[in-house]
Swiss-Prot record:
GO cellular component, one term: neuron projection
Protein's recorded name: Calcium and integrin-binding protein 1
Pfam families: EF-hand_7
Gene source species: Bos taurus
Any one Gene Ontology molecular-function term assigned to this protein's record: calcium ion binding
Gene that this polypeptide is encoded by: CIB1
Keywords: Angiogenesis, Apoptosis, Calcium, Cell adhesion, Cell cycle, Cell division, Cell membrane, Cell projection, Cytoplasm, Cytoskeleton, Differentiation, Lipoprotein, Magnesium, Membrane, Metal-binding, Myristate, Nucleus, Repeat, Spermatogenesis
């Protein structure tokens, strides 16, 4: 990665800065980290911009390894039809949304998509159950009982489901998130 052919052009860097919430230095670091996941012979700028990295490789990054939503995060940001790999631009989009400078609206929009496990545009009881299981862990010691889960989801819906349709839509989710001062600062990944 030391040769002149291994750096992103000034034009491309400027374009990525315009399209993301990342600084020039953050984009260069992201490119370096992405290239480290590629085989040595495919690390030129041209090849790295065309390459796709498997979700397994992305999930091996220390910044994602401990995140309980890591698989969902990667699937939401993947543009491949099978959602099983990320391009460099997918990786940049992911880092941009999770950066300190991304707006609360952008962060809440993507958090909603990550928590919408069935991709139907709403958070229903099953999505909320999966969300809770991701947060509490799925071991016998940490898993909630069926009655505890039902009570928790009932409470979440009581608090969040403004139109009382049994689900949480994006605007209801954003309303709840707007009342959570720690959300934006906790919804981040730093390389």
């Amino acid at each position: 990665m030391g040769g002149s052919g291994s750096r992103l052009s000034k034009e491309l860097l400027a374009e990525y800065q315009d399209l993301t919430f990342l600084t020039k230095q953050e984009i260069l670091l992201a490119h370096r980290r992405f290239c480290e996941l590629l085989p040595q012979e495919h690390r030129s700028v041209e090849e790295s911009l065309q390459a796709r990295v498997s979700l397994e490789q992305i999930l091996s990054l220390p910044e994602l390894k401990a995140n309980p939503f890591k698989e969902r995060i990667c699937k939401v940001f993947s543009t491949s039809p099978s959602r099983d790999s990320l391009s460099f631009e997918d990786f940049l989009d992911l880092l941009s949304v999770f950066s300190d400078t991304a707006t609360p609206d952008i962060k809440s929009h993507y958090a909603f998509r990550i928590f919408d496990f069935d991709d139907d545009g709403t958070l229903n009881r099953e999505d909320l159950s999966q969300l809770v299981n991701c947060l509490t862990g799925e071991s016998e010691d940490t898993r909630l009982s069926a009655s505890e889960m039902k009570q928790l989801i009932d409470n979440i819906l009581e608090e969040s489901d403004i139109d009382r349709d049994g689900t949480i839509n994006l605007s209801e989710f954003q309303h709840v998130i707007s009342r959570s001062p720690d959300f934006a600062s906790s919804f981040k990944i730093v390389l």
